[in-house]
């Protein structure tokens, strides 16, 4: 380098330490300034260029139009190039004229000139690639300015010293160069306009990071606008940014799915290659037999393949940050030596202070960008896992559903996916922690020599303990997750059947079950927490113990080893660095343990079998046929016997085919087979054209009526009007508060069963499909509506005429109008053909018609089929009881098919006017000008209130509530213990400072024992106090979890039915799962970390102020800055967290809704649409999640700047006051300041996390304080023993509405039912029949009037005293998972003989006795492994056991075939002959022998007399009887 400078004007030396270091006025040599210093920016740009060009090539955002800013940048670049070339030509000019400049004057202008030309070209290339702000060029211009500052100062000082400018030309060109690069730097900080095709031009609220400048991205300033806005106004969903394209669910899930499919293909190839050949020799067979089991697809590998690159980038940031963290201890060492050396130049100390600040700022920036990458990757983890699970849940087979309930799958989507998100920030610790430990040990070795090996040995001894804790924690985690799954599953069942629990007064039994599971869950949590606290002592003490052991060995191993300030506090700083990886290792192990459990669960679910999309072939089939089945054999699961055998069916195109047969013969299974829902064992199935499907029990979405009908299709007003008219929905629209924009509510809760079925049918009609599969759609409506629907929709004259229709039905009167009939028996086709042909055969079908057709028609059946052509439906609607829902379950399938009815509440709750239409359904034709109005929903059209995020700060009462739940004494004790541990920590370090000063006084060795002993005692005391605080917090946290869950559970179990009608079950379950999870496992650790960081920060500031009192001057401005950042951050992050919490519930509600309707979704080929809807809901959640992550980074930059200023001022004041400070105090002060950044940052983070997570307590308390129903027992007003003795029921001027503000559904009802009377209750749909029974049980409370039973006002007694004395057999039979005995007798009140007697009378004895488990036969969730008919018989057995004086039948036999119905009616007449029986009936023939019949019309008594008198009066009842063929 000296040769480049020559020996002339620049001198001959490249470096001169006397000029640059050992002086009070340092400078660099002219040679250094004109060579290396000028080349540094150029070297940087040329080194960065290849990678940057590669990046630009693969990240083109579209070109930016040439702007004035871009032109100005270009001009500056050209001018800089010209200045460099002017310097070069000036050197050549000197050479020509014999002055021979130094070689550097040729090389440097050439290098700088070419580099400036490169920078100019790069500006243009960046513009063409859409770069708005170039980080590479900003750094380049910044380096140019920084490197020019030294010669800028030197030239001025030289000119001042010499009194003249020695080289005017180069002096001038240099300052022109400086002005130009400074201008270029300033211009580079301004952003260009967005690219021509940028999303910002069309997106109203684009993600600001994409268009932010480099400095804004570097310091996260682009978030400041939201922080200020969030401080001034509570953030709402509309204020949130759109997501970047790469962060959207669709892209993330697709990438993960592709990686998972690749894993599955690799596994399939591996299995294929591992399969032994057919002709293997004996030796080969031995070898093959020893092969390992075939491997399974690895979800972990799929995750790494998808997100590995993000982890690699974050790992680079982490590596740089880890290396930088070891620079400050070395700078501290230099600073202490500087303090110890009074002869050292002052600028050394200021330089060290500046370098410590600069190093700390670089650490902060790099660490925050690392966290940004890693947390974003964590969110992508969660997004991808949720999306993959959602897609898998849409295609799992029925055999898988018995193993995976909706509750378990929701846990996979919520808890397990969240655990992967929580794990992401810790993953890099797998390599980072060992690296930091190794580097710390290396530098400690440099400082203390071999003595450090003693500390290392101690750390190695901790590893087995760590492993043992990990094993135990994993075992606890597995057990706890199983219990949590059981609790969530049971809670979903309780929500599903809450109405039944209330009707039977069974809440205490299920309350006891939930509390039993919860007790086991809390016991495991308590054990795990105590195990964790015992290790807390070890981990808290381990860095200190390592320090102590190392120092002890150091001072005792060699008498010449003296512990001075440099060795002690540099070692303490290194041990503080060591503390972080050691302290994070337990959290890493805990998170890895939890994630490994979750990984296994997710992988197991994703590896389950899927439905075969090729089981139903869509290719062209036999000409003229729409459906063909050839030799078809089907089963619901591979391990079960076939349900359908050897089917050979051909359905002509455009035909109307009826499928009939007895209960359990496989009618609904046939529909399922056609949909591809069953597993095909043999044969072929062909279907040509699109399919529409109407399940036996309607599946309704939680959206408007119109959206349910359109089902994703575009609105065609004419077809929409025709559909509503044909499905008899027009009159309903007039009654619904919001017309067709009325929100139907979750599971259609504000519609009657008939209305839900007609909406489901309307969905199929509007779809305009080619093939319609109708699974008994007429069973849920009365005979008049059924006839209307058949005539105008299904029949030969209906809107579906000409379409292929497969109708499962028991409506005898409709059969003559079908093209042909398929008769099933025992899963096989027993007869098939047109109606007349089947009659002529005189087979089982003809015999059945003769037995069960109405009397007046029997004589005509054998004459000709035309005699029945115009017959009315006689209300003999045999409801196929095989599938309780769309197609997922078969009649005789014993498998626990639990998914289908999870989260379902089969409610009879109706809209404000009851169940639907209140008058006959005439054929209503629309005039040309009459249209169904498609308008915005009326204000009262919404049923479910949208969940709103709370605004403002969390009320102090919420913190107080949690403190009371923990225990006030416990809370106080925890705080005092932390005060004690902080005092012990300060004492230990002050004692160490005094110990190091002994070296200056040359104290004797015998003083060392005292110093070491006190230091050890204080350190161990600190760890012991922290352990006690952790144990107290663990005990208090578990206590709080118990109290809060108990309050929530008890309130919800006592909530009125109206609460469940208007609150989505997903929202309630989210509270029981996610919010309780936060209370159980998140809050206590967050509080501990907050206390730890708070007392650490206070301790640091106290120590620094005590060491350097001058520091108090800057405390106030730094505190103001800190408070400002905290205030802006807290307001914004709190609201973002609330928005995230609120937007999470719809994800789970939609998921449960999707799984419930999976068969319908697949039938309509809308799986992809629902995946998009799910992705949209997840994206809505992410829109608050990403800003929340950025808010933490924005906070950290601000807070760590404050912390780094503390480091700067601590070092500066130590330099300024070095004459009055000893090295021990300086070491103590600065080493403490190096910790304050982390403590201050962590304190705000934990404060925010606490406020964010305490929202869970807020929600739990909110749901724990909702209005409850009346007391179960009123001690002062209990009915007498044996009440009611007679069973008299009297309504006195009784009126009722479903909720405040709605219209009355019963108006001034007055009637008297005598004891022992049999009263039938009839009326058109929506008349208020079911409402009347709900009032009797006080599910609905009176708006006016009263109900008296045996003279006692039911409003005066407790609900359980009332409900336990009444019995209902509901319309929708609900069973719970558990034994049959539990479903009949949850309290264990009856003997086994009584239960068998009830089963005998309810015609279930044969079935139950044939089961190996007998009464312990396990019912699946919802009783789905029993047919609907069998479940209804179980409800009859319940009624027989209760033996109450009043029995209510709510269309109880609607799901039973006629033969079973006759048996049940006979049982009721004999066993309840002395009881008062109230029957809501669709089949009028079942009540014709009743004492009286009550006819309701629009909530009032229209007729009330004996059936004979009512028929004679020729009123409403007469009309209904005539329609049914009974009059």
From Swiss-Prot:
Transmembrane segments: 33-53, 74-94, 100-120, 133-153, 172-192, 303-323, 350-370, 427-447, 451-471, 534-554, 577-597, 964-984, 1022-1042, 1086-1106, 1108-1128, 1200-1220, 1223-1243
Keywords: ATP-binding, Cell membrane, Glycoprotein, Lipid transport, Membrane, Nucleotide-binding, Phosphoprotein, Repeat, Translocase, Transmembrane, Transmembrane helix, Transport
Molecular function in Gene Ontology: ABC-type bile acid transporter activity; ABC-type glutathione S-conjugate transporter activity; ABC-type transporter activity; ABC-type xenobiotic transporter activity; ATP binding; ATP hydrolysis activity; ATPase-coupled inorganic anion transmembrane transporter activity; ATPase-coupled transmembrane transporter activity
Function noted in UniProt: ATP-dependent transporter of the ATP-binding cassette (ABC) family that binds and hydrolyzes ATP to enable active transport of various substrates including many drugs, toxicants and endogenous compound across cell membranes. Transports glucuronide conjugates such as bilirubin diglucuronide, estradiol-17-beta-o-glucuronide and GSH conjugates such as leukotriene C4 (LTC4). Transports also various bile salts (taurocholate, glycocholate, taurochenodeoxycholate-3-sulfate, taurolithocholate- 3-sulfate).
Disordered: region residues: 910-932
UniProt domain ABC transporter: residue ranges: 629-851, 1291-1523
Cytoplasmic topological domain: 54-73, 121-132, 193-302, 371-426, 472-533, 598-963, 1043-1085, 1129-1199, 1244-1527
CDD domains in UniProt: ABC_6TM_MRP1_2_3_6_D1_like (cd18595), ABC_6TM_MRP1_2_3_6_D2_like (cd18603), ABCC_MRP_domain1 (cd03250), ABCC_MRP_domain2 (cd03244)
Expressed in which tissues: Mainly expressed in the liver. Also expressed in small intestine, colon, prostate, testis, brain and at a lower level in the kidney. In testis, localized to peritubular myoid cells, Leydig cells, along the basal membrane of Sertoli cells and moderately in the adluminal compartment of the seminiferous tubules.
EC code: 7.6.2.-, 7.6.2.2, 7.6.2.3
Reactions the enzyme catalyzes: taurocholate(in) + ATP + H2O = taurocholate(out) + ADP + phosphate + H(+); glycocholate(in) + ATP + H2O = glycocholate(out) + ADP + phosphate + H(+); taurolithocholate 3-sulfate(in) + ATP + H2O = taurolithocholate 3-sulfate(out) + ADP + phosphate + H(+); taurochenodeoxycholate 3-sulfate(in) + ATP + H2O = taurochenodeoxycholate 3-sulfate(out) + ADP + phosphate + H(+)
Residues carrying a glycan: 18, 1006-1007
Residues binding ATP 2: 1323-1330
InterPro entries per UniProt: AAA+_ATPase, ABC1_TM_dom, ABC1_TM_sf, ABC_transporter-like_ATP-bd, ABC_transporter-like_CS, ABC_transporter_C-like, MRP, P-loop_NTPase
Residues recorded as bearing Phosphoserine in the entry: 908, 911
A Pfam family this chain is assigned to: ABC_tran
Domain ABC transmembrane type-1: 311-594, 971-1252
Full protein name: ATP-binding cassette sub-family C member 3
Family classification: Belongs to the ABC transporter superfamily. ABCC family. Conjugate transporter (TC 3.A.1.208) subfamily.
Keyword Iron-sulfur set for record: no
């Amino acid at each position: 380098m000296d040769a480049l400078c020559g020996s002339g004007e620049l001198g001959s030396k490249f470096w001169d330490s006397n000029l640059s270091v050992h002086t009070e006025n340092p400078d660099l040599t002219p040679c250094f300034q004109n060579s290396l210093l000028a080349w540094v920016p150029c070297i940087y740009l040329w080194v960065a260029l290849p990678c940057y060009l590669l990046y630009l090539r693969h990240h083109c955002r579209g070109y930016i139009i040439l702007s004035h800013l871009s032109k100005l940048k270009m001009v500056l670049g050209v001018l800089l190039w010209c200045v460099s070339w002017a310097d070069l030509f000036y050197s050549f000019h000197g050479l020509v004229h014999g002055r021979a400049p130094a070689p550097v004057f040729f090389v440097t202008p050439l290098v700088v000139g070419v580099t400036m030309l490169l920078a100019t070209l790069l500006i243009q290339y960046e513009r063409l690639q859409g770069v708005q702000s170039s980080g590479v060029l900003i750094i380049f211009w910044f380096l140019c300015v920084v490197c020019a500052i030294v010669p800028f100062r030197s030239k001025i000082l030289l000119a001042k010293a010499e009194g003249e400018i020695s080289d005017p030309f180069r002096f001038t060109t240099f300052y022109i160069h400086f002005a130009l690069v400074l201008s270029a730097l300033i211009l580079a900080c301004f952003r260009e306009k967005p690219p021509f095709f940028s999303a910002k031009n069309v997106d109203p609220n684009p993600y600001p990071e994409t268009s932010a400048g480099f400095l804004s991205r570097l310091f996260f300033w682009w978030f400041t606008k939201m922080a200020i806005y969030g401080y001034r106004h509570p953030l709402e969903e509309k204020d949130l940014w759109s997501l970047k394209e790469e962060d959207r669910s669709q892209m993330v899930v697709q990438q993960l799915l592709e990686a998972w499919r690749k894993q599955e293909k690799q596994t399939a190839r591996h299995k294929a290659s591992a399969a032994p050949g057919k002709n293997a020799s004996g030796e080969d067979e031995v070898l093959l037999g020893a092969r390992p089991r075939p491997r399974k697809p690895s979800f972990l590998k799929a995750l790494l393949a998808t997100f590995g690159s993000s982890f690699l980038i974050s790992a680079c940031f982490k590596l740089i940050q880890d290396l930088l963290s070891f620079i400050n201890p070395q700078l501290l060492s230099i600073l202490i030596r500087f303090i110890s050396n009074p002869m050292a130049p002052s600028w050394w100390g200021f330089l060290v202070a500046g370098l410590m600040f600069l190093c700390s700022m670089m650490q902060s920036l790099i660490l925050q960008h690392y966290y940004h990458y890693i947390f974003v990757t964590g969110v992508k983890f969660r997004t991808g896992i949720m999306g993959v699970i959602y897609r898998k849940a849409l295609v799992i087979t029925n055999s898988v559903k018995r193993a995976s309930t909706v509750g378990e799958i929701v846990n996979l989507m919520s808890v397990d996916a969240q655990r992967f998100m929580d794990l992401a920030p810790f993953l890099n610790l797998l390599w980072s922690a060992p690296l930091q430990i190794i580097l710390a040990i290396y530098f400690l070795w440099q400082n203390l020599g071999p003595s450090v090996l003693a500390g290392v040995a101690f750390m190695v001894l901790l590893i087995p303990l760590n492993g043992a804790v990990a094993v135990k924690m994993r075992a606890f985690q597995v057990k706890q997750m199983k219990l949590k799954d059981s609790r969530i599953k049971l809670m979903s069942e309780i929500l599903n059947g809450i109405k039944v629990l209330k009707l039977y007064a069974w809440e205490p039994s299920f309350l006891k079950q939930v509390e039993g599971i919860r007790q086991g869950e809390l016991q495991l949590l308590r054990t795990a927490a105590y195990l964790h606290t015992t290790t807390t002592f070890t981990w808290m003490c381990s860095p200190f113990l390592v320090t102590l052991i190392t120092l002890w060995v150091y001072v005792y191993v060699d008498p010449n080893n003296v512990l001075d300030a440099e060795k002690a506090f540099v070692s303490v700083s290194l041990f503080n660095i060591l503390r972080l990886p050691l302290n994070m290792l337990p959290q890493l192990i805990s998170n890895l343990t939890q994630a490994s459990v979750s990984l296994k669960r997710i992988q197991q679910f994703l590896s389950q079998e899927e439905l075969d999309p090729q089981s139903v072939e869509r290719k062209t089939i036999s000409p003229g046929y729409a459906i063909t089945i050839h030799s078809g054999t089907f089963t619901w699961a591979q391990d079960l016997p076939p349900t359908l055998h050897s089917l050979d069916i051909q359905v002509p195109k455009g035909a109307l085919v009826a499928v009939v047969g007895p209960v359990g013969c496989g009618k609904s299974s046939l529909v399922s087979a056609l949909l591809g829902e069953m597993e095909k064992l043999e044969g072929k199935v062909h279907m040509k054209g699109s399919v529409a499907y109407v399940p036996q029990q309607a599946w309704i979405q939680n959206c408007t009526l119109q959206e349910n009908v359109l089902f994703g299709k575009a609105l065609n007003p004419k077809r929409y009007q025709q559909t509503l008219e044909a499905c008899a929905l027009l009159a309903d629209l007039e009654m619904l508060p919001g017309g067709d924009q009325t929100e139907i509510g979750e599971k259609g809760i504000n519609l009657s069963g008939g209305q839900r079925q007609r909406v489901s049918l309307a969905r199929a009609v509007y779809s305009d499909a080619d093939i319609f599969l109708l699974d008994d759609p007429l069973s849920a409506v009365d005979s008049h509506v059924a006839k209307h629907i058949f005539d105008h929709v299904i029949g030969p004259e209906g809107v579906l005429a000409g379409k292929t229709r497969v109708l499962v039905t028991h409506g005898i009167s409709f059969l003559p109008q079908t093209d042909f009939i398929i008769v099933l028996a025992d899963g096989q086709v027993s007869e098939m053909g047109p109606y007349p042909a089947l009659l002529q055969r005189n087979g089982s079908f003809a015999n059945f018609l003769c037995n069960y057709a109405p009397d007046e028609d029997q004589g005509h059946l054998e004459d000709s089929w035309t005699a029945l052509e115009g017959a009315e439906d006689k209300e003999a609607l045999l409801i196929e009881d095989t599938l309780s829902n769309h197609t997922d379950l078969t009649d005789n399938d014993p498998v626990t098919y639990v998914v289908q009815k999870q989260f379902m509440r089969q409610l009879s709750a109706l809209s404000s006017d009851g169940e639907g239409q209140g008058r006959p359904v005439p054929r209503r034709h629309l005039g040309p000008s009459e249209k169904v109005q498609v308008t915005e929903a009326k204000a009262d059209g919404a049923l479910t209130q949208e969940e709103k995020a709370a605004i403002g700060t969390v009320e102090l009462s919420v913190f107080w509530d949690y403190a009371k739940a923990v225990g006030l004494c416990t809370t106080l004790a925890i705080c005092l213990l932390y005060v004690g541990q902080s005092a012990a920590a300060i004492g230990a370090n002050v004692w160490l400072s005094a110990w190091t000063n002994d070296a200056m006084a040359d104290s004797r060795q015998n003083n060392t024992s005292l110093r070491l002993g006190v230091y050890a005692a204080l350190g161990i005391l600190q760890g012991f106090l922290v352990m006690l605080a952790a144990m107290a917090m663990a005990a208090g946290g578990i206590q709080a979890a118990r109290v809060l869950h108990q309050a929530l559970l008890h309130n919800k179990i006592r909530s009125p039915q109206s609460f469940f009608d208007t609150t989505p079950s997903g929202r309630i379950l989210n509270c029981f799962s996610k919010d309780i999870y936060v209370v159980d496992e998140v809050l206590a650790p967050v509080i501990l970390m907050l206390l730890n960081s708070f007392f650490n920060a206070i301790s640091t500031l106290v120590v620094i102020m005590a060491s350097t009192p001058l520091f108090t001057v800057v405390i106030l401005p730094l505190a103001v800055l800190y408070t400002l950042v905290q205030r802006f951050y807290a307001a914004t992050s709190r609201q973002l967290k609330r928005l995230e919490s609120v937007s999470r519930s719809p994800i789970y509600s939609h998921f449960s809704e999707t799984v419930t309707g999976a068969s319908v979704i697949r039938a309509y080929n809308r799986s992809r649409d629902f995946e998009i809807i799910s992705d949209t809901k997840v994206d809505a959640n992410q829109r608050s999640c990403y800003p929340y992550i950025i808010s933490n980074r924005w906070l950290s930059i601000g807070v760590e700047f404050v912390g780094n200023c503390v480091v700067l001022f601590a070092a500066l004041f130590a330099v300024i006051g070095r004459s009055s400070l000893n090295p021990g105090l300086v070491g103590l002060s600065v080493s403490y300041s190096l910790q304050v950044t982390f403590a201050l940052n962590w304190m705000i983070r934990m404060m925010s996390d606490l406020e964010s997570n305490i929202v869970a307590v807020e929600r739990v308390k909110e749901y724990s304080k909702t209005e409850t129903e009346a007391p179960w027992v009123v001690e002062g007003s209990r009915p007498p023993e044996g009440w009611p003795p007679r069973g008299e029921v009297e309504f006195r001027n009784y009126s009722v509405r479903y909720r405040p503000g709605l219209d009355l559904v019963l108006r001034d009802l007055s009637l008297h039912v005598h004891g022992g009377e049999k009263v039938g209750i009839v009326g058109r749909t929506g008349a208020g029949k079911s409402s009347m029974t709900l009032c009797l049980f006080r599910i609905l409370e009176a708006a006016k009037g009263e109900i008296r039973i045996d003279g006692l006002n039911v409003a005066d007694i407790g609900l359980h005293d009332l409900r336990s004395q009444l019995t209902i057999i509901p319309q929708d039979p609900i069973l719970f998972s558990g034994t049959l005995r539990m479903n009949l007798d949850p309290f264990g009140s009856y003997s086994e003989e009584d239960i068998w007697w009830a089963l005998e009378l309810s015609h279930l004895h044969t079935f139950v006795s044939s089961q190996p488990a007998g009464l312990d036969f396990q019912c699946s969730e919802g009783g789905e492994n029993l047919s609907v008919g069998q479940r209804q018989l179980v409800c009859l057995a319940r009624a027989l056991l209760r033996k109450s004086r009043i029995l209510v039948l709510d269309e109880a036999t609607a799901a039973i075939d006629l033969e079973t119905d006759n048996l049940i009616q006979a049982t009721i007449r004999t066993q309840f002959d002395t009881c008062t029986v109230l029957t809501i009936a669709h089949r009028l023939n079942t009540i014709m022998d009743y004492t009286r019949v009550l006819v309701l019309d629009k909530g009032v008594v229209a007729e009330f007399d004996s059936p004979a008198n009512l028929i004679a009066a020729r009123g409403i009842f007469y009309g209904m009887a005539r329609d049914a063929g009974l009059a």
